[in-house]
Structure formats: C-alpha cells, structure tokens
Amino acid sequence: MTSTQAIFEKVQKVKKTINTATTAEKNHALEEMAKQLWLSRTDILAANELDMTTAKGKISDVMLDRLYLDEERIAAMAEGIRQLIDLEDPVGQVLERTELDNGLVISKKRVAMGVIGIIYESRPNVTSDAAALALKSGSAVVLRSGKDAYQTALAIVTALKEGLAQTKISPDCIQLVSDTSRASAQAMMKAKGYLDLLIPRGGAGLIQAVVENATVPVIETGTGIVHVYVDKDADQDKALAIIENAKTSRPSVCNAMEVLLVHEEIAERFLPRLQKMLVTDRVAAQEKTIELRLDEKAAQYISGSQARPEDFDTEFLDYVLAVKLVSSLEEAVEHIEAHSTHHSDAIVTENDSAAAYFTEQVDSAAVYVNASTRFTDGGQFGLGCEMGISTQKLHARGPMGLKELTSYKYVIQGTGQVRK
C-alpha cells in the first residue's frame, strides 16, 4: 500500500507535464483514456461485481444502483470523456486586458489549478469524470474513493493510466489513494502545499467533515434537499410530469426532488392525482412506489405516512417524498429558504409574476421555472461531465465544469517602467 504522503510527493514531481500541456496533447490524452476505458470494460465489470457482492446487504438498493456498472454505463463514461475534447480549453484564456496610462499592459489570464484532490463515495463515474476534467483543465488529480467502490475505482484508474501511457502526459498525474480509512481522508484535508483544491462528493457527513477540518481550499458540493413548488396557477398536467421525472427517474442522485410543496387552493384536485401517479399507477405497473410523507393538511386529502419535522430536512436519496401544503407563494419561498441546501429548487406556474418572485427570492445554485430539477448536471448544461454541484458562492456555484477548476494570474508587460 502506497502511503498518502508518497502519493502527494509523486504527483508534485509530475504535475508540470499536465499543467503545461498543450490543448492538442490534452485532447489526445482524453481520447486515449476514453479508448482504454472501453477496452478495459471486462476488467472493470469484474471489479464492479466484487464491489457489488461485498456491498449487498450493507447499503440500500438505491445506493447499490449508484455503485452498479454495466457496458452501457461504461460507454457513457467513455463518451463523457470524449465530450471534453470538443469543449474549449480554458487554460491560457485572457479574461481581461488593460493598458494603463504609463504604458503597462495588464492581462488577466486563466491558469491551471495545479493538483486537485477528490474525496468521494460509491459513484464509479466520478473516478473517470474527475480525472478527465482535471486533465483538460490542466491539473493533476488525487482520488480517494469510498471503500464500497474501491475495486471498481482501481480498475478504472488502471485503464485511464494505461491510456495516458500512450501520450506525453505522465500517467502519474492520476493518483488513487489505496487507503480508504478515515486517516487518508484526514491526510488529504491537511495536505496544504500538496493539494491546491479539495472537493468532497458524497453525503452530508462527508461534506461537513471536509468543510470543518480541511486546511486546504475546499469547494463544497452540497447535499440536495430539492424542492418543487406547485403554485395555484400551475398547469397540473405539466406539474405531474415534472414531479414524476424529478422524483422517480433516479432517486439516488443529488438533483432528485425530496420535498413537494403544493398551494392549498389546488390540493383537493391535485393531490389525488399525485397519489395515483406515484402509488396506484406504479403498483399496477409493478414499479417501486413512492412513500408519501404528508403534513397534517396534505393528509386530509390523500393517505400516506405522517411527516416528521426532520423529513423536511432530509436528503432521502430513495423512493420517499415529503409533502407539505402552503397557503401562499411567499410561504413556499420561506419554507425553501429555511430548509433548502441551496442546490436546486423549482416552481411550476403559469403566472409570470409568481415565477419572477420565486427566481429572485430563492437563493439556490439552480432555480427552475416549469422544468425538472434533474437538469442540474454538467452534461445537461453543456459543460461536459462535471466535478460536482457547488452550493457555495465563492469561486464556483452550480455544476462545476472546466472553467470552475481553474484559477487566474496577472501578466504585466512593460517597457522598462518603474514606480514613482
């Protein structure tokens, strides 16, 4: 087992091969990585089967779905890498250029971050996405997977490094920490001087631990207590379609809806239709039903479990939905501001004034009008694969693509000027 410190030192020695790589060299590397990922699919699937076997009975079915890989998902991972080839290289872009009265020309230039650390849980695609994004944005990467997905992550990293071996960029620019204990996570949090940025991707406990304990700069990828508010002026057919997609298409992801707010004026007609869609129709289709956790007002119209106060502060990542009735748009916004993690929140309404009020007042990274929250995703936003969804305001907010993984410096060109 290679120590975490040894990994930090190794990546420092080779980071210049990626920090200074040309766009053509990086794109060639991405193509080779994508190619080798697909060619190694048999090994990756075998490793994933080991992880799945070990994890069964220890994590929920929804979390098992996050961990599971098949050829289709590996193909999507490879395609995600290739999509970055077509995106503009942010490194070297001149953001601003100013000529002063004294003749100095000051340029603000985008540069690589250096070395990026990622601590994540049971998401195999994060391994390939993070490595590819770091590479295209000019940085080396140190990956620390959760133990549930370690064998899969190792097989993926092995394939990516085999791809890099065919290029001018050192394979050691991608490092996977073999120690999945808390000690390695702590080492990454304290790796000042080795990591230029640390990004946690996972549950609330992991993210909170990193934010509270790290001495290196951190971008917080928040949990998703995601709300959909159905206004009294909503198109109810549209609302039901949005809710079905936001809750059932993939409940285990951070942009899935967890809380439904409904204006009480439409509850009598709307809630029975909601229950039919999420429960009755799914029973008939032999699909997993949604457990509805209802506040007292909602329970007057449909049946379900009684909602506890903490249900409105929980990222279920499962087939569970908390439902609350509100008396006004203002009450809906107040509830969201009190309980949201500022990830993604949506309003369904045909009232332009209500939509404008919602988008101005809700302080989340992504605010939707008449659309599913499942679109909060780098690929859907045209950014390619993403490093995560930032819920903070400094440096990056929302889906983090290539530009969000860079920094900048000032280049000052003179002709001999001295300060008087």
Swiss-Prot record:
<dbReference type="InterPro" id="IPR012134">
    <property type="entry name" value="Glu-5-SA_DH"/>
</dbReference>
<dbReference type="GO" id="GO:0050661">
    <property type="term" value="F:NADP binding"/>
</dbReference>
<dbReference type="InterPro" id="IPR015590">
    <property type="entry name" value="Aldehyde_DH_dom"/>
</dbReference>
<comment type="function">
    <text>Catalyzes the NADPH-dependent reduction of L-glutamate 5-phosphate into L-glutamate 5-semialdehyde and phosphate. The product spontaneously undergoes cyclization to form 1-pyrroline-5-carboxylate.</text>
</comment>
<dbReference type="GO" id="GO:0004350">
    <property type="term" value="F:glutamate-5-semialdehyde dehydrogenase activity"/>
</dbReference>
<keyword id="KW-0560">Oxidoreductase</keyword>
<dbReference type="InterPro" id="IPR016161">
    <property type="entry name" value="Ald_DH/histidinol_DH"/>
</dbReference>
<dbReference type="InterPro" id="IPR016162">
    <property type="entry name" value="Ald_DH_N"/>
</dbReference>
<dbReference type="InterPro" id="IPR000965">
    <property type="entry name" value="GPR_dom"/>
</dbReference>
<protein>
    <recommendedName>
        <fullName>Gamma-glutamyl phosphate reductase</fullName>
        <ecNumber>1.2.1.41</ecNumber>
    </recommendedName>
</protein>
<dbReference type="GO" id="GO:0005737">
    <property type="term" value="C:cytoplasm"/>
</dbReference>
<comment type="pathway">
    <text>Amino-acid biosynthesis; L-proline biosynthesis; L-glutamate 5-semialdehyde from L-glutamate: step 2/2.</text>
</comment>
<keyword id="KW-0963">Cytoplasm</keyword>
<dbReference type="Pfam" id="PF00171">
    <property type="entry name" value="Aldedh"/>
</dbReference>
<keyword id="KW-0641">Proline biosynthesis</keyword>
<dbReference type="GO" id="GO:0055129">
    <property type="term" value="P:L-proline biosynthetic process"/>
</dbReference>
<dbReference type="InterPro" id="IPR020593">
    <property type="entry name" value="G-glutamylP_reductase_CS"/>
</dbReference>
<keyword id="KW-0028">Amino-acid biosynthesis</keyword>
<dbReference type="InterPro" id="IPR016163">
    <property type="entry name" value="Ald_DH_C"/>
</dbReference>
<comment type="similarity">
    <text>Belongs to the gamma-glutamyl phosphate reductase family.</text>
</comment>
<keyword id="KW-0521">NADP</keyword>
